[in-house]
Structures are given as C-alpha cells and as structure tokens.
Amino acid sequence: MNGTEGPNFYIPMSNKTGVVRSPFEYPQYYLAEPWQYSVLCAYMFLLILLGFPINFMTLYVTIQHKKLRTPLNYILLNLAFANHFMVLCGFTVTMYSSMNGYFVFGQTGCYVEGFFATLGGEIALWSLVVLAIERYVVVCKPMSNFRFSENHAIMGVAFTWIMALACAAPPLFGWSRYIPEGMQCSCGVDYYTLKPEVNNESFVIYMFVVHFLIPLIIIFFCYGRLVCTVKEAAAQQQESATTQKAEKEVTRMVIIMVVFFLICWVPYASVAFFIFTHQGSEFGPVFMTIPAFFAKSSSIYNPVIYIMLNKQFRNCMITTLCCGKNPFGDEDASSAATSKTEASSVSSSQVSPA
C-alpha cells in the first residue's frame, strides 16, 4: 500500500521512513511545504471574505423586499442559506486548520466540517434538481397548466434538505466516516479505504449512485426536453414574444448554475471515484486537495449568477446598498417589467426571471 491508514485517518504517503503522524495532532509539513498551507489558508480567507457578505445580502435583500418573496426564489434562497452555513461552520474551520498545517479541531471537528461541506454541496445539487423539474413542468407542460405555488416551493425546499441529510448524516451514525483528505486540513467522506467496520464501500457506492448520478440524470433529462420544447414553441410561435423571452431568461440562469456546479464538483467527484476504485494506488496529497478546495468555491457562484442575471434582484440589491435609493433610477421600470411573470408564480404560460 502506498498510503498509511490510521484508526481515524488516511495519509497518502507510505510510513516506511516513520515520518507519518496523525493529522489531528501534528503539522503535516512532510506532505507539502509550509507555504502551500499558507496558500490554502489565504484561499479560504478569500472565500469567507466573498461568501459571507454575498450570501448574507442575498438573504437580507429578499427579506427586505416583499416583491422578491416568490415561490421560485424560495429555492434560490435555500441555496444561499446553505452556502452561508457552509461559510460560517465549514470554511472558518478549514482556514484555521490550514493556518496550523493540520486539522487542529480533532476527530469531532472533522466530522462537523465534513458534515457541513457535504450537506451544503448536496443541498446545492438537489436544489438544482428541483429547479430543473420546475423548469420542465412549467415550460414543457406535461401536467397541462401547472402553477408553481408557494406550497410546491416549500415542499421543494424540504425535499432538498431531506435528500442532503440522507447523504451527509449516515457517517455521523456509523455508516462510513469523515476523515481529513488531501493535505489533511479539510474533511470529507472516506473514499480512500474500504473500512468494513463502518461498511464504507456500500456507502460510497450509495452516495455516487443516489446522490450524484441520479440527480445529474434528472437534470440533463429535464433540460434536454426543455431545449426541444423551447425550440418547437419558437418555431410555431405558440407563446408571445414576451413570454418566450421570460422563459428563456429563467432557463438560461438555471442552466448557467448547473454548468458552474458541474465545473466545481465534477473534478472532485471524479478524483474521489478514481481513488475509491484504485485502492492503495499512489497519489500525492495535492491530487485530492486541489479539487476539494476548488469545490468549496461553489458557495459563491450561485448568488453571483443570480444577481448578475436577474435585473429585478440586482436593482433591489443596489437599492439596499444605497440606503433605499437606486442611483440608476430603473428599479420601478424593472419591477413593472417583471411583475407580470415574476418567479413562475403565475400561470405556466407566463414565466419570468426569478
């Protein structure tokens, strides 16, 4: 074996020289140079510096502006809330650990950080599933004139948390485990060992199939059908130009969110799957560290995409930041332009940007 397995950790280095130490007790500078840990620390500080205000303002602006409290926005707010929690409970832990060169919070802290990282990623994924289904049902109309109501949105939010907990919680109760990964400063599910004592193999397979492949299949199916429907409607002029434009704008925003999710998480999932299917193979600590830390940037991009592509929300954000006044003076126009179709809360033939 090219790694060293301990009772609650796995170090991607053989202990032939006797230098390997527990990542909960000693700095791991034999895995990487101290400056590399400093880079990780600076990166996490940047994510906190950006992620905290962006997600907080997304929540605050929506609470302050009643017109933004629409059904589809509940799902997007759910994303912001989960990301905010990740920043506070996960990123701060990882930053401090990187500063010290090892996971200073012990095994309990590792479970906490791993849980919130997994929970946040899964809430994001299942929220995108709910958004994809909403887009499919509203635009493709398989259920005739379906209206995405507040009750549907609440059920969608509850569904994302149930599915995310079904993925993140089992390691807390003995099915698999959370261990330090890569350079041993952040924690995640144990992809490195089979660990029969905690039935690790079955959990990793369950996680990949139920909480990664199936959601992606649903998302690609919904958007595949949606693209075909939009093209057919445009060709046949079945909807008004305003409605078609509104549907396309909402769909574009959600598709961009999906693309960025894939950019952030597919490298991590691919590396994890490779490690799991090549037990004992040789790989360096940076091999898992880079995709793991890159995946954490997902806490920032959804609110940014939402703010960039949603004129109504962007104007409300500017108004809030400027103490109730919009220096660009187009808030009312934006509100009027979107009031007909905001957030899929009207009939299925009238959909606009959330």
Curated annotation (Swiss-Prot):
Side of membrane Extracellular, spans: 1-36, 97-110, 174-202, 275-286
Sites of S-palmitoyl cysteine lipidation: C322, C323
Its biological purpose: Photoreceptor required for image-forming vision at low light intensity. Required for photoreceptor cell viability after birth. Light-induced isomerization of 11-cis to all-trans retinal triggers a conformational change that activates signaling via G-proteins. Subsequent receptor phosphorylation mediates displacement of the bound G-protein alpha subunit by arrestin and terminates signaling.
Domain of life: Eukaryota
Protein name according to UniProt: Rhodopsin
Disulfide bond positions: C110-C187
GO annotation terms (biological process): absorption of visible light; G protein-coupled opsin signaling pathway; visual perception
Motif 'Ionic lock' involved in activated form stabilization, residue numbers: 134-136
Annotated keywords: Cell projection, Chromophore, Disulfide bond, G-protein coupled receptor, Glycoprotein, Lipoprotein, Membrane, Palmitate, Phosphoprotein, Photoreceptor protein, Receptor, Retinal protein, Sensory transduction, Transducer, Transmembrane, Transmembrane helix, Vision
Key word Glycoprotein present: yes
Keyword Cell membrane found: no
UniProt xrefs under SMART domains: 7TM_GPCR_Srsx (SM01381)
Residues bearing the modification N6-(retinylidene)lysine: K296
Membrane-traversing stretches: 37-61, 74-96, 111-133, 153-173, 203-224, 253-274, 287-308
PTMs per UniProt: Contains one covalently linked retinal chromophore. Upon light absorption, the covalently bound 11-cis-retinal is converted to all-trans-retinal. After hydrolysis of the Schiff base and release of the covalently bound all-trans-retinal, active rhodopsin is regenerated by binding of a fresh molecule of 11-cis-retinal.
Gene Ontology CC, one term: membrane
